[in-house]
Regions:
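N-terminal glycine-rich FAD/FM-binding segment characteristic of electron-transfer flavoproteins
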Residues: 1-249
Length: 249
């Protein structure tokens, strides 16, 4: 079996975001890009599955839809342990576009397991994995916190309200993973970093697919208003603030 892990290139959470072009795009100047944390955990679990030879996993490939600026993030994934990588040479316009590109690669390369992080830390869309399964007409399982193989079939644990659910689906399938899929992300060793330099990154031009969404405007959240504390023994002050300042009564 072959595993494909979808990875995103996202701004580090300490980055101060600025907008450009009339607040319709993000100013990428000075941004520190990192591997999306959810995808890093997904990759870690994929490598753990491959390490257990009883699972019959022949290879773990990572795929990214984006420009060449994502190369360092792709190389990090290779250093962590992925066997090879695929980069679709296009800007990731929206989830529909990204999913359509990945689905086309899966059709051609015949991957058995497609793993996605439950969301990216920049847009928090949680849409790509489900869309990939719909494009391909294969099962998808969301909120996966555990995955293993028994007799060649996947057995997945997913979080539900009030407990956990154990499900199994036929191969091929999409697993949309979340917290718990791996204890912690695998760290790239020096040997892995050196080997990553020579691992293949296959460059693919995008297939024709138009995004379904258009960004109208970005804006930062409003600053939090100051909080005023009123002594419990002074209800008159509370009433005055509600009437004359907050104007809610």
């Amino acid at each position: 079996m072959k595993i494909l892990v979808c990875i995103s290139n996202v701004p580090d959470t300490t980055t101060k975001i600025k907008f450009a072009e009339g607040n319709t795009s993000i100013d990428t100047t000075g941004i520190q890009w990192v591997l999306n944390p959810w995808d890093e955990l997904s990759l870690t679990r994929a490598l753990e599955l491959k390490d257990d030879t009883a699972n019959g996993i022949k290879s773990v490939t990572v795929i990214h839809v984006g420009p060449a600026t994502a190369e360092p993030t792709i190389r990090k994934a290779l250093a962590i342990g992925a066997d090879d990588a695929i980069r679709v040479n296009a800007n990731s316009s929206d989830a529909w576009f990204v999913a359509s590109q990945i689905a086309e690669v899966v059709r051609k390369e015949q991957f058995d397991v497609i793993m996605c992080g439950i969301e990216s830390s920049d847009y928090n869309g949680s849409a790509v994995g489900g869309m990939i399964s719909e494009f391909l007409g294969i099962p998808s399982v969301s909120a996966v916190s555990g995955i293993k193989f028994e007799n060649g079939l996947p057995v997945m644990t997913r979080e539900i309200d009030g407990g956990k659910e154990v499900v199994s689906v036929p191969v091929p399938f999409v697993a949309i993973v979340q917290k718990g899929i791996a204890k912690e992300p695998r760290i790239a060793a020096m040997r892995g970093i050196m080997m990553a330099r020579s691992k293949p990154v296959k460059l693919i031009e995008p297939v024709q697919s138009e995004p379904l969404t258009q960004i109208v405007e970005f804006e930062k959240p409003a600053q939090r208003a100051a909080c005023k504390f009123v002594d419990a023994e002074n209800p008159a002050q509370l009433l005055d603030l509600l009437q004359n300042e907050a104007k809610v009564i």
